[in-house]
Curated annotation (Swiss-Prot):
Residues 200-246 are annotated as: Disordered. Capsid vertex-specific component that plays a role during viral DNA encapsidation, assuring correct genome cleavage and presumably stabilizing capsids that contain full-length viral genomes. This is Capsid vertex component 1. GO terms for biological process: chromosome organization.
Amino acid sequence: MNAHLANEVQTISATARVGPRSLVHVIISSECLAAAGIPLAALMRGRPGLGTAANFQVEIQTRAHATGDCTPWCTAFAAYVPADAVGELLAPVVPAHPGLLPRASSAGGLFVSLPVVCDAQGVYDPYAVAALRLAWGSGASCARVILFSYDELVPPNTRYAADSTRIMRVCRHLCRYVALLGAAAPPAAKEAAAHLSMGLGESASPRPQPLARPHAGAPADPPIVGASDPPISPEEQLTAPGGDTTAAQDVSIAQENEEILALVQRAVQDVTRRHPVRARTGRAACGVASGLRQGALVHQAVSGGAMGAADADAVLAGLEPPGGGRFVAPAPHGPGGEDILNDVLTLTPGTAKPRSLVEWLDRGWEALAGGDRPDWLWSRRSISVVLRHHYGTKQRFVVVSYENSVAWGGRRARPPLLSSALATALTEACAAERVVRPHQLSPAGQAELLLRFPALEVPLRHPRPVLPPFDIAAEVAFTARIHLACLRALGQAIRAALQGGPRISQRLRYDFGPDQRAWLGEVTRRFPILLENLMRAVEGTAPDAFFHTAYALAVLAHLGGRGGRGRRVVPLGDDLPARFADSDGHYVFDYYSTSGDTLRLNNRPIAVAMDGDVSKREQSKCRFMEAVPSTAPRRVCEQYLPGESYAYLCLGFNRRLCGIVVFPGGFAFTINIAAYLSLSDPVARAAVLRFCRKVSSGNGRSR
């Protein structure tokens, strides 16, 4: 919960800068994280509970519908709880008294908060996407992105009504625990338990059950409050009925105050109609408007007379105008008139004595825990947990709302409150015309939607939107589009380089002995097969894994290098060296096996510096750009330069997307990817926004 609290503070401080938006607190289940390819063991290393900083980082990005626009990646607070994630909210553990709230076990999850961008009226686009990037290492292969559309992220209603049973159960468990402590319980906890017991309709003085069976005829002790209550079950809470109605969801503190003020106004009008305001005489003393009951008490204290039945009925009639109390004489008040200043409805400060069961629960909790914490306080108030299912992984996540929260569903949520008006309008329009997609609507239907929601201009009217409109899988389709464009460019570049049967020469210099002539002949004979297997391996790479390769990172660096001077754009992660963009002689390679199945063997690109220009058919020497410490873990292939080992076929690229295919022995040919990579400027910009970040000149690293 602390991650949710921290994200609220961060959002409140940034609201004026980033525009209208809301925040949705979620708990992403361990099953959902695992299905997204995130190793749970990596999230548990260096847990804050063990005294070290968390070994992972979470970043958030908002992606607009159909336009390709994105907000910059920004860091968000997150915490991973390996077990009982929802249970931590519903039944928190007090370190000094771990048995205070028993709870059933449940799955773990990641606590994080996702922003929802909206307009000034709180209307959000259901097809917009919140992207969460979780990195447990510095390389691109040690990060995964989970996408949440606003439609699946924002539930239709909260579920505070389902939480009333839990609050009562927490009170009973506290009474039970205090009774079991007996004389060891703090006096304040005993007092709180006694009041809770009376409020819950149980014995006012709970006592622990005796260890020995009482003899026959002995009076039975009153039962321990909460002794028969089952543990608090997160799964029961998630599946129990109790969804709030839409009207209850929209109720806020401001609306409640408006209703109260309306009732007060009606009462004042009624009193004014019965007793019109009269001009105050010179002898009348200034007074403060008071309720009839308080006025009657003041009159009785001053006059000493007893009230009759008529007076008692008048007490309940309504409020009085200032200076016109029927129980107060028009003459100046004597010494007893100062009692008006002690009117409990106006000037008397509140008492520190708890006035409700919830406040007595607070008193007892603080006495047992030796203090209080914000997360404990929020757990003792109403909590809404809404079970949702993630489209990409088909696993569960939970949307959480707190009574004291300003995020979505919170009782203190600030305007504008999120509204599903756009989603409802799209559904109703499609149903009315019996079409599947909104862009299939008639021109009149589209015009009506555009009049109400101008944000639909690009999805409905743009002839070639960057992303497919009104498609929950639009981001997946866009990633596949970039992947396919890169594969086509690679295939076309290789075919162009090999047209006319060119002679593949030794571009990287290695010396061979006389006894290696037979080996060179065998390798030369296998060149066509090796190249064919290489293309199959590259084409068979899944889109998500493709963006971890040297080829994809070089493409992103090439696209991001168009940003100009001052600030440039680099791929996420630090797979590319900071000096990669400084020279055309800097290459990053992927190594593929030459025996058995052709597979990519390196987890991160291998950076190599060429001493000469390999594109001019001259021999060059190469070296690793960065020395790897001898103690650092690395794969066997990372110990060899391109072409140095017979076991690897190497594919490398520089900042200008000039590529080189290196066979064993240093034999190679060059390719020109940039000449065949066909991406329009809007598509290239959208790719850079999703897979890169801006850095200052001279700093090429980015986690």
